[in-house]
From Swiss-Prot:
Protein name in UniProt: Anther-specific protein SF2
Biological role stated in the UniProt entry: Anther-specific cell wall protein which could contribute to the cell wall architecture of epidermal anther cells via intermolecular disulfide bridges.
Organism encoding this protein: Helianthus annuus (Common sunflower)
One GO CC term, this protein: extracellular region
GO terms under biological process: cell wall organization
Localization terms from the record: Secreted, Cell wall
Major location category of this protein: secreted
Domain of life: Eukaryota
């Protein structure tokens, strides 16, 4: 009996480990902060990125003798912007009298309509 429960526990633990390993890893997007211009300190940079930039973390990077503060964001939280929908097709405007004549099946002066049964002759 104890052997069955140990086997069941090991199997359950194995399934749990496999389920966790299948989850997608978090991808981070990095961006240089424009507001932090002091000598780069890891703790200050991280604090600035978390409070002012709403980032997950921050770190310092030296590029061509210039110290940069880089903020790291969780890419999965920010969906890419969707393009704007195309503009609607242009509206066709008709003269009120022409449209009314078509609706009422009445001929306008100079208009020839062979299907008009109620038209004056």
């Amino acid at each position: 009996m104890a052997n069955n429960s140990v086997s069941y526990l090991v199997l359950l633990l194995l399934v749990f480990v496999l389920a966790i390993s299948e989850s997608a890893p978090v991808q981070y997007c990095d961006r240089v902060t424009n507001l932090y211009h002091e000598k780069c300190d890891e703790k200050q940079c991280t604090e600035h990125c978390k409070t002012n930039e709403k980032a997950e973390s921050g770190y310092c990077l030296v590029v061509e003798k210039q110290q940069l503060s880089i903020c790291s964001f969780d890419c999965s939280k920010y969906k890419p912007s969707t393009p704007a929908p195309p503009p609607p097709p242009p509206k066709l405007f008709y003269s009120g009298s022409w449209l009314q004549a078509k609706v009422e099946n009445v001929m306008l002066p100079g208009q020839k309509n062979m299907n008009c049964t109620q038209c004056p002759k």
